[in-house]
C-alpha cells in the first residue's frame, strides 16, 4: 500500500501547480469519511463529521468513532463551514480525472443538490482512501520548541501598575535541561474498587498521623448506599468504572470521602486529580494532604500569584507556610542573572517569568533552566505527584512547560482517577468557559490609552515602531468610528428586524433573513445574493462589493456607501423596497464589522509579547482554545462568532468554541482506543444538587450510582428548619432599574422587626441579593436602621474600593470571626464553595433572608449556551440515528431550533414559557436556594437552633389578580413533590432533599398571593 507522502508526490506530477496539495488531500480525507459513514450524504455538509459529535447523546464506541475522533484533530481546519466550502470548491475545480471523487448536481424537490461518488476510472493511486484512513488513525501531532543555547538574550518585563514595558538582557551559558519525560499514554483504565472497610482503615491511618483529623469520625458516621434500577441499599464497596456519579446532601461527608480516597489511592501509587472550585481551596487541599505524607502538588495559573499569596496568607504571620511559598514566591533564575535592569523592573515578577519568551534575533526560545528553576516547580511536580489538585480553569487551559502540552492532555493520558467536586457547578463553569464574551465598547475605551501613547510619541520613536504594532494601533484608532457606525446602522436600517436585532445575531443570521425575504418577493436573483455573501467571507472577489465594504464602517462616507449599494442593486436588476435595501446595507455593515474584528485579532497575535496588553477584548480575541477544540466536541451550533446590541452595555461579542461540559461528563471517552473503547481516566462526580431533573444548567446527565447519607440526627435537625414566607407585597425582582433600589430598601424597612428579632437569636444573619451593587445598597440602608451596636458587612469583589463595612469574597470563610452581625451577599457569589463555620465547625449563620428572588440574568449569552447544552443532553435523542453523519446533522438542527426558541422566550413572562423552559427556571432556582440554604446546614452541635429561612421579596409569589402567573413557592412545592414521588428516581431525591422538603412544606403554604402582577423573565441588574 502507498504512503501519504507517495500519494502527494504522485499528485504533484499530475495536478497544476496552482492546486494546494495539502488542501486537496484534506478534501479527499473528509469526503472519504463521508463515504464511509453515509455514501449518499451531502458533500457540502461533510464538515459535520469533524466535530467529535459521536461523544454526545448515547456515546458510540466503535472503530468509526475512533477514526472520527482522530479526524477531528487532524482535519480541524475543515470543520468550519466556511473553510470547508473553500476547500471543497477548490477540490471540485481541480482536474477531475485525478480526483478520488466526482460530483453531479441533481434537482430534488425543486432544489439543486450536490452528489458525489467514487471515481471508478481513477488511474493515479486508486487505493488512497485506505491510505487516508490509516494515516488518520496513526497520526500524532508534532510539537516544535527550542531551548535557548549559550549566548545573549533579552526579555521584557511589564509594570503591572501601568502599561510601561522594561527590557532586560541576560547572558546564558550553554546547557541542556533535563526535563521530566511523560511515560507512554496509559491504555484503558481498570475500574477502581475499594471497600468501605479499606477506606475506614486508611482514615484510621490518617488519624494516627494527625490525631486531630476528623475524617475517620465523619466517614464512620455516614452511610454509603448503592442505587440499582431505582432501588437503594447499603453498600460495602465503592466501584468507579469510567464515570460514576455519587450524590449526598450537605454534611454527608463528600469532601471527607474525597480526601480519604485520595490518600488511599496515593498509597497504591495511583495518579489522582482533584478538581476544586477556587485556588485557595486547591492550595489548602495540598497543604492538608501533605500532612499525611501524600505526594501532592497544585496546578494553578501563573499570572495571579500575588492575589493567591494574599488569599492564603494568615493574619499576623510574617511568612507564608512552606507548602504555599515553594509554589507562590519562588524566584526566577533568569531574573536573577539579568543585567541592566531598572529599579522598577527589579521587583519579583511573579507570573511573568520569561519561560518561553527569551528573545534573540526576533525569535522566542524556551528557558534552559526549566528543569531546576524554583519558579516553575509546580509544573514539574505534575510528573511525579500521586495527587494533583487544580481548578476547572486550570484543568481546561493550563499548559505544561517543555513541550507546551495541555495539562488536560497529560491528564487524559496518565491519570487513573479524576474527582470533580461540586460537579453541577463544574459543568456550568465549563460551558461558560468555552463561550467567552466581551464588550466592544469597553475595548474601545481601553484602546484610548494605547492610542494616546502612540499619538504622544516623538517622531523618531514613531518611525522606529515595529510594523505589526503600528498596524495594530491604526486599527485601534478606528474603533470609535466603527462602534458608532455599527450601532447607528442597527438603528437606521433595522426596519422589520427589530426582533432579530434584540437577540444575538451574526452576519450569517442576517444573510439568512435576507434570503427568506427574497424568497417571498424575488427582489434579486439568488445567484447575486450568494455571490455577495461569498465576497464578504472571502470566497470570491468583486471590486464593486469590496469597494462597498471599504466604506461600510465609515460615518463620513455614508453617502458613498448608500450610493454604491444602490448602484450594485441596479446593476443586478434589483428594484427593492426601502426595507429590503436597508437590510442589505445592515448585512454589509455587520459583515464588514466581522472582518474588522478578525483583522484586530490577527494583528494582536503578531504583536511583540511586551506590547500585548491584558484587556477584555484582546483576551477574547487571542484565546482561541485551538488545542482544546481538537479534544472536545464542538459547540452544538458550530464554533460561532456573533454579537448582541445591548441598550446599556453596547456591542457584546461572543464566541462558541466547544461543548464545555463534555470535558467532565465525557472525559473517559475523550481518548479512544483503536477499537473505540474509552482510554481516558475514570471519573468520580460529587455534588449535593447535581440530581435536579429538569434543570438544564445544573442537572448532571449521568445516572446516580451511589448515595452518601448523613447521620439521622443531622437530617432531623435540618428538617426542623423554619421556612417562612414574609408575605410582603413589594417586588424587588422583575422591577425596573429605577424602582429596584427603592423597592429593596422598602422590603428591608417592612421586615425590620423580623431582622431585629433574629439578631437576638443565636447565629449571624445572611442576606441574599442579586448583585454587588445591591449588596452595597442593602448594607448601607441596614447600617442606618440598626441600633444596639449591630453592624452589617457587604461582600465585595477583590477589585472594589474597600471600606470597613465590606468583606472580601476571598475572606468570607472567616466571617464567624468578623465583627459584623449580618452579611449581605449576591446569590451567585455565595451559593457554594464556602464553609462559613465557627471554631467547632458549626455554621456561623443562624438565618438567611432572601431579599430578592435569586435569579441570574436569563438573557445572558453564556447562560443560554449552558442551558442549550443541558437541553441537548437531556432531550435530543440521537441513539435512533444509525450513522455519525445523521447524528451530527440532527444535533446541529435541534440545537439551532432550541436556540431560536430560547431567544424568543428571553423576555417573556415566566408564566408564558414553554414547559421545558419553565421547569428549568423552577429547578434552577431550587438548586440556587438549596445551595444557599446549605451555608446554614453545617451542623455539629445538636443543641443549637435549627436554621431559619425567610422569603422577603414579593416576587416569590404571583399576583392574586393573575391566577395564571408564575408563583415560585407553589412551583417549588410541585417540583419537589414530583421528584420525591417519582417511582424510578424518588429514592435519590428523597436522600438528597427530604429534610429540605419537609421543612419547606411545613413552612410554606400553597396558593398565597402577592398583590402585584407577574413581571417579565428578566433581571435588570446582573450579578
Predicted region positions:
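N-terminal accessory nucleic-acid engagement/regulatory domains that precede
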Residues: 2-203, 567-595, 599
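Conserved helicase/translocase P-loop NTPase motor core
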Residues: 359-416, 426-427, 610-677, 824-826
Amino acid at each position: 500500500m502507498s504512503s501519504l507522502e507517495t500519494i502527494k508526490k504522485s499528485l504533484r506530477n499530475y495536478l497544476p501547480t496552482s492546486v494546494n496539495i495539502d488542501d486537496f488531500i484534506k478534501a479527499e480525507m473528509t469526503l472519504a469519511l463521508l463515504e464511509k459513514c453515509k455514501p449518499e450524504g451531502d458533500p457540502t455538509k461533510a464538515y459535520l463529521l469533524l466535530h467529535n459529535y459521536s461523544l454526545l447523546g448515547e456515546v458510540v464506541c466503535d472503530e468509526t468513532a475512533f477514526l472520527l475522533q482522530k479526524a477531528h484533530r487532524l482535519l480541524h481546519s475543515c470543520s468550519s463551514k466556511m473553510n470547508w466550502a473553500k476547500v471543497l470548491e477548490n477540490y471540485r475545480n481541480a482536474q477531475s480525472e485525478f480526483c478520488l471523487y466526482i460530483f453531479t448536481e441533481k434537482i430534488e424537490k425543486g432544489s439543486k443538490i450536490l452528489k458525489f461518488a467514487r471515481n471508478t476510472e481513477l488511474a493515479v493511486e486508486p487505493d488512497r482512501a485506505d491510505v487516508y484512513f490509516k494515516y488518520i488513525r496513526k497520526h500524532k501531532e508534532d510539537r516544535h520548541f527550542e531551548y535557548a543555547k549559550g549566548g545573549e538574550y533579552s526579555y521584557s518585563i511589564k509594570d503591572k501598575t501601568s502599561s510601561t514595558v522594561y527590557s532586560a538582557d541576560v547572558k546564558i551559558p550553554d546547557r541542556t535541561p533535563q526535563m521530566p519525560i511523560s511515560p507512554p499514554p496509559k491504555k484503558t483504565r481498570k475500574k477502581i474498587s475499594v471497600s468501605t472497610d479499606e477506606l475506614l482503615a486508611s482514615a484510621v491511618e490518617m488519624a494516627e498521623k494527625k490525631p486531630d483529623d476528623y475524617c475517620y469520625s465523619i466517614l464512620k458516621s455516614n452511610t454509603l448506599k448503592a442505587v440499582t434500577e431505582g432501588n437503594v441499599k447499603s453498600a460495602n464497596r465503592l466501584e468507579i468504572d469510567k464515570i460514576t456519579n455519587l450524590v449526598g446532601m450537605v454534611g454527608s461527608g463528600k469532601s471527607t470521602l474525597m480526601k480519604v480516597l485520595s490518600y488511599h489511592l496515593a498509597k497504591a501509587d495511583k495518579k489522582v486529580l482533584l478538581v476544586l472550585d477556587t485556588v485557595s481551596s486547591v492550595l489548602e487541599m495540598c497543604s492538608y494532604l501533605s500532612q499525611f505524607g501524600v505526594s501532592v502538588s497544585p496546578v494553578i495559573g501563573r499570572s495571579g500569584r500575588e492575589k493567591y499569596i494574599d488569599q492564603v496568607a494568615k493574619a499576623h504571620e510574617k511568612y507564608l507556610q512552606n507548602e504555599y511559598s515553594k509554589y507562590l514566591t519562588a524566584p526566577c533564575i533568569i531574573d536573577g542573572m539579568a543585567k541592566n535592569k531598572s529599579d522598577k523592573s527589579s521587583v519579583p515578577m511573579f507570573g511573568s517569568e520569561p519561560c518561553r519568551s527569551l528573545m534573540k534575533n526576533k525569535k522566542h526560545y524556551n528557558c534552559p533552566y526549566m528543569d531546576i528553576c524554583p519558579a516553575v516547580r509546580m509544573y514539574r511536580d505534575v510528573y511525579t505527584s500521586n495527587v494533583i489538585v487544580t481548578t476547572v480553569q486550570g484543568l481546561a487551559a493550563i499548559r505544561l512547560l517543555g513541550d507546551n502540552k495541555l495539562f488536560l492532555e497529560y491528564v487524559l493520558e496518565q491519570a487513573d482517577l479524576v474527582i470533580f467536586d461540586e460537579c453541577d457547578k463544574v459543568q456550568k463553569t465549563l460551558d461558560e468557559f468555552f463561550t467567552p464574551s466581551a464588550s466592544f465598547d469597553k475595548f474601545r475605551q481601553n484602546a484610548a490609552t494605547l492610542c494616546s501613547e502612540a499619538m504622544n510619541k516623538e517622531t523618531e520613536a514613531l518611525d522606529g515602531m515595529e510594523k505589526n504594532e503600528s498596524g495594530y494601533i491604526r486599527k485601534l484608532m478606528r474603533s470609535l468610528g466603527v462602534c458608532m457606525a455599527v450601532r447607528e446602522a442597527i438603528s437606521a436600517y433595522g426596519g422589520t428586524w427589530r426582533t432579530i436585532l434584540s437577540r444575538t445575531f451574526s452576519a450569517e443570521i442576517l444573510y439568512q433573513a435576507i434570503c427568506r425575504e427574497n424568497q417571498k418577493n424575488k427582489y434579486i436573483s439568488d445567484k447575486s445574493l450568494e455571490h455577495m455573501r461569498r465576497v464578504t467571507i472571502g470566497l470570491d472577489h468583486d471590486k464593486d462589493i469590496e469597494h462597498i465594504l471599504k466604506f461600510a464602517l465609515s460615518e463620513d462616507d455614508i453617502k458613498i456607501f448608500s450610493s454604491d449599494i444602490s448602484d450594485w442593486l441596479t446593476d443586478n436588476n434589483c428594484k427593492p423596497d426601502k426595507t429590503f435595501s436597508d437590510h442589505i446595507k445592515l448585512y454589509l455593515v455587520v459583515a464588514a464589522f466581522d472582518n474588522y474584528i478578525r483583522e484586530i485579532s490577527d494583528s494582536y497575535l503578531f504583536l511583540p509579547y511586551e506590547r500585548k496588553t491584558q484587556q477584555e477584548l484582546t483576551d477574547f480575541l487571542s484565546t482561541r482554545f485551538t488545542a482544546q477544540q481538537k479534544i472536545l466536541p464542538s459547540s452544538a451550533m458550530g464554533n460561532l462568532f456573533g454579537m448582541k446590541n445591548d441598550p446599556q452595555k453596547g456591542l457584546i461579542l461572543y464566541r462558541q468554541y466547544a461543548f464545555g461540559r463534555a470535558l467532565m461528563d465525557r472525559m473517559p471517552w475523550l481518548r479512544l482506543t483503536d477499537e473505540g473503547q474509552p482510554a481516558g481516566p475514570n471519573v468520580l462526580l460529587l455534588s449535593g444538587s447535581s440530581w435536579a431533573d429538569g434543570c438544564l444548567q445544573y442537572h448532571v446527565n449521568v445516572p446516580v450510582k451511589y448515595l452518601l447519607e448523613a447521620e439521622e440526627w443531622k437530617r432531623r435537625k435540618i428538617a426542623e428548619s423554619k421556612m417562612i414566607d414574609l408575605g410582603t407585597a413589594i417586588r424587588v425582582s422583575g422591577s425596573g432599574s429605577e424602582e429596584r433600589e427603592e423597592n429593596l430598601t422598602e422590603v428591608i424597612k417592612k421586615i425590620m422587626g423580623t431582622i431585629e428579632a433574629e439578631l437576638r437569636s443565636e447565629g449571624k444573619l445572611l442576606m441574599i441579593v442579586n448583585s454587588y451593587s445591591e449588596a452595597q445598597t442593602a448594607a448601607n440602608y441596614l447600617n442606618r436602621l440598626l441600633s444596639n451596636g449591630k453592624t452589617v458587612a457587604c461582600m465585595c469583589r477583590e477589585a472594589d474600593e474597600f471600606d470597613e463595612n465590606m468583606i472580601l469574597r476571598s475572606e468570607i470563610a472567616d466571617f464567624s470571626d468578623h465583627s459584623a452581625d449580618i452579611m449581605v451577599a449576591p446569590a451567585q457569589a455565595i451559593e457554594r464553595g464556602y464553609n462559613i463555620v465557627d471554631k467547632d465547625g458549626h455554621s456561623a449563620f443562624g438565618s438567611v433572608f432572601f431579599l430578592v428572588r435569586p435569579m441570574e440574568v436569563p438573557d445572558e449569552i453564556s447562560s443560554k449556551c449552558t442551558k442549550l447544552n443541558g437541553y441537548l443532553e437531556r432531550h435530543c435523542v440521537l441513539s435512533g440515528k444509525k450513522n455519525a453523519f445523521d447524528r451530527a446533522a440532527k444535533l446541529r438542527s435541534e440545537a439551532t431550533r432550541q436556540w431560536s426558541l430560547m431567544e424568543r422566550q428571553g423576555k417573556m413572562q415566566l408564566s408564558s414559557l414553554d414547559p421545558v423552559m419553565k421547569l428549568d427556571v423552577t429547578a434552577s432556582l431550587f438548586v440556587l436556594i438549596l445551595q444557599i440554604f446549605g451555608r446554614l446546614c453545617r451542623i455539629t452541635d445538636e443543641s443549637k437552633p435549627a436554621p431559619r429561612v425567610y422569603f422577603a421579596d414579593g416576587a416569590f409569589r404571583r399576583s392574586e389578580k393573575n391566577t395564571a402567573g408564575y408563583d415560585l413557592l407553589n412551583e417549588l412545592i410541585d417540583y419537589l413533590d414530583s421528584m420525591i414521588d417519582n417511582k424510578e428516581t424518588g429514592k435519590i431525591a428523597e436522600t438528597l432533599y427530604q429534610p429540605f422538603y419537609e421543612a419547606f412544606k411545613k413552612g410554606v403554604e400553597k396558593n398565597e398571593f402577592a398583590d402585584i402582577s407577574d413581571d417579565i423573565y428578566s433581571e435588570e441588574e446582573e450579578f
